[in-house]
Regions:
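Long, low-complexity, charged/polar intrinsically disordered accessory regions
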Residues: 186-363
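Active-site-flanking beta-strand signature of metal-NTP-handling nucleotidyl enzymes
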Residues: 10-18, 213
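Histidine-centered divalent-metal-coordination microenvironment in nucleic-acid enzymes
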Residues: 13, 112-146, 211
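Short helix/loop capping segments that flank catalytic or ligand/cofactor-binding pockets
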Residues: 21-25, 145-148, 220, 224
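Helical (often loop-to-helix) elements that flank the catalytic cores of nucleotide-handling enzymes
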Residues: 137-182
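A solvent-exposed, charged loop/short amphipathic helix patch at secondary-structure junctions
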Residues: 23-81, 154
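A short, contiguous, amphipathic alpha-helix enriched in charged residues
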Residues: 84-115
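Extracellular/periplasmic catalytic domains that process cell-envelope and extracellular macromolecules
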Residues: 4-7, 129-130
Length: 363
């Protein structure tokens, strides 16, 4: 990527989920100090008789953070469906965004595609409440002809960062996904908190650090699990009741044959989310293939420089490198080899048992 890409109009956008219930939170006041969680002047309670206030100032590692104040009021089913439809919501956002840009500069969508190209990289991050947020770097590039598609140039004049910001906010407010009637005629939208920040050239490295931090988070932040689970394992998992409710709702939705293609059960451990942690548009930056090829060439040159054998150096320096595998066999070649292996394994087991017994006698 050219160094001039840092001068293109670019935004760091955070797209959040809507509220599915009141949860314990940690907020900072104008002075930067943490504030009380959910202070209320009245003694209001929910329909289940649970007080809707919390006067505590939670620590950053407080296990209550992200937990619903009333578990019965929290819409776990809606949250699972929202996570499940998030990838489709983002796909439609990428369709709405160029249209919103075209409206703001007063031209048709077709003409816009001849002038600019929207590039992005997004990272999915789990929040403590179990919902997935997206952190996205969105950049405007000049649209290039097909024979120069790999080139990245600055967009024409008139396509500044202010135009891009207005379009992002408009697209986020307009886009929606209507789910099938089998899910209760549920409509998926972005939450009201859309954070948009301008990225200056000197901030590129800092934003990359943010994205790397978000990419390392997983469902563990919400108290979830990293592996797939079956319905009969849910009750025995070491998770919070909040996460357990997510899992049960996912498996309840998976039981409906009409929803089989949405794979709620297969992604129950991900709280319904089916997308990737990190994705990008084709021309945003280099490709994984290019990185693999560069890494392969680097390792090849390192091995070539370290080798002292003339034949190996000649083979490694060949223009064409061919590697092949041939199936030799499975298991032991003879019955005697199998007997020796079984005897060695039996002796190892006996020695471990004897060592454990010796430790018990010493205790």
């Amino acid at each position: 990527m050219p160094d001039t890409v840092g001068e293109h109009p670019a935004l760091f956008v955070t797209l959040t989920a809507p509220s599915f219930g009141v949860v314990h939170t940690r907020r900072a006041g104008p002075d930067g100090k943490p504030r009380r969680c959910r202070p209320r002047r009245d003694a209001r309670v929910c329909e289940h008789g649970v007080p809707l206030s919390c006067a505590l100032v939670h620590d950053e590692d407080d296990s209550q953070l992200g937990q619903p104040i009333c578990a019965e009021c929290f819409d776990h089913r809606g949250a699972v469906m929202w996570n499940n439809a998030l990838s489709e919501l983002w796909r439609r956002t990428t369709i709405y965004l160029p249209r919103a840009i075209a409206r703001r500069v007063g031209m048709t969508h077709r003409r816009l595609r001849e002038l600019v190209r929207v590039s992005y990289m997004k990272v999915a991050e789990y929040q403590r409440r179990g919902l997935v947020h997206l952190h996205v770097v969105i950049r405007l590039d000049r649209a290039m002809p097909s024979y120069r598609a790999a080139e990245v140039k600055a967009p024409p004049a008139g396509f500044g960062v202010e135009v891009l910001e207005d379009a992002v906010r408009a697209a986020a407010g307009e886009v929606s996904v209507r789910l099938p009637a089998t899910l209760g005629d549920f409509t998926v939208r972005w939450g009201g908190e859309v954070d948009v920040r301008h990225i200056e050239a000197h901030e590129r490295r800092r934003v990359a650090g943010y994205l790397a931090k978000y990419a390392t988070k997983s469902t563990e932040l919400a108290g979830g699990v990293l592996h797939r689970v079956a319905a009969h394992q849910v009750d025995g998992l070491p998770v919070t009741e909040h996460v357990r409710a997510y899992l049960w709702e996912a498996f309840a939705l998976a039981a409906d044959p009409a929803l089989a293609e949405r794979r709620f059960g297969g992604y129950a451990h991900a709280l319904g989310y089916r997308g990737h942690c990190l994705t990008k548009s084709r021309r945003y930056s280099t490709t994984f293939r290019a990185l693999r090829e560069a890494r392969e060439e680097h390792v090849h040159q390192e091995l070539l420089a370290r080798s002292t054998d003339a034949d190996r150096r000649a083979l490694a320096g060949a223009i064409e490198r061919v590697a092949s595998f041939r199936f030799v066999g499975l298991g032991h070649l003879t019955a005697a080899d199998a007997l020796l292996a079984a005897s060695a394994a039996a002796r190892a087991r006996e020695q471990r048992c004897a060592a454990r017994e010796a430790l018990l006698l010493e205790a």
